[in-house]
């Protein structure tokens, strides 16, 4: 029974006040080992695969249809890989595979680990803003990210594999689907997200230290793009499970 609760058993809605997403590129061979057998990497030029770090201020997280005052607010950092999945019906779905999640609220850590497979951990995330520079830090883990939100004419990060920001937006997230996998039962859990008014804006990353990503020891990792989205109503449909066989 408890395992069924983790399969996103009901629809959920929330409001993203702002979401800063940093996407890192690596040779696809370096990320292949991090995803389950049912998924394939979503690549650029059949060479680069991507891991994203999303830092999201969220409010009003609650079962869909419940009044807003019953919702929870929290800060979330999600670590995910861009992937593809071919469904039983033959549909090719783009989405994300979650490696881990961090939050500043103990309640969110508990509920997140009851109702999802996203590996929530409570940390000491703090966000401050001074002179148009956003500083996101965790004194426990050593995470530190500084983002310049003032400039409107932002260049792609040095060594980015993308030719321009239009090309880079394909790997901005969030994507329509999130996948989890039970290798023992060979079941894939598919959660579909629905968003509105999604306009990602390029941002400049002044500096970044992200221990979770560094501890994966990914060779050839480079910052590929960075975006912010603001004021986004979002909801996730109830999760659905299907059996997987190699196809």
Q: Where is each model-derived feature located?
A:
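Terminal, regulation- and interaction-focused segments at domain boundaries
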Residues: 11-18
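Glycine/small-residue-rich interface belts in oligomeric ring/scaffold proteins
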Residues: 12, 29-79
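Interaction-surface and assembly-scaffold signal
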Residues: 2, 117-247
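Secondary-structure boundary elements
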Residues: 27-41, 82-92, 243-245
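A domain-level signal for the structural core that forms small-molecule/cofactor-binding pockets
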Residues: 6, 74, 225
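N-terminal intrinsically disordered, low-complexity segments enriched in P/E/S/T
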Residues: 2-6, 13
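Aromatic- and glycine-enriched beta-alpha-beta binding-site module
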Residues: 60-141
């Amino acid at each position: 029974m408890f395992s069924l609760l983790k399969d996103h058993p009901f629809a959920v809605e929330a409001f993203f006040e702002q979401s800063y997403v940093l996407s890192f590129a690596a040779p696809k061979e370096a990320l292949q080992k991090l995803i389950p057998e049912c998924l394939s990497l979503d690549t650029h030029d059949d060479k680069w695969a991507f891991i994203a770090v999303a830092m999201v201020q969220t409010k009003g997280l609650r079962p869909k249809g419940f009044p807003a005052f019953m919702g929870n607010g929290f800060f979330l950092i999600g670590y995910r890989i861009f992937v593809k999945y071919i469904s039983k019906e033959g549909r090719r779905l783009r989405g994300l595979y979650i490696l881990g999640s961090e939050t500043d609220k103990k309640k969110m850590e508990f509920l997140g680990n009851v109702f999802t497979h996203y590996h929530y951990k409570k940390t000491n995330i703090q966000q401050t803003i001074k002179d148009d520079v956003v500083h996101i830090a965790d004194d426990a883990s050593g995470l530190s990210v500084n983002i310049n939100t003032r400039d409107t004419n932002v260049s792609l990060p040095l060594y980015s594999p993308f030719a321009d920001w239009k090309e880079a937006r394909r790997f901005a997230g969030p994507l329509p689907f999130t996948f989890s996998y039970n290798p023992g039962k060979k079941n894939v859990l598919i959660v579909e997200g629905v968003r509105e008014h999604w306009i990602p804006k390029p941002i400049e990353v002044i500096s970044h230290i992200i221990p979770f990503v560094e501890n994966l020891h990914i060779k050839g990792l480079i910052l590929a793009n960075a975006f912010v989205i603001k004021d986004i109503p979002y909801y996730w449909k109830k999760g659905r499970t299907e059996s997987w066989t190699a196809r």
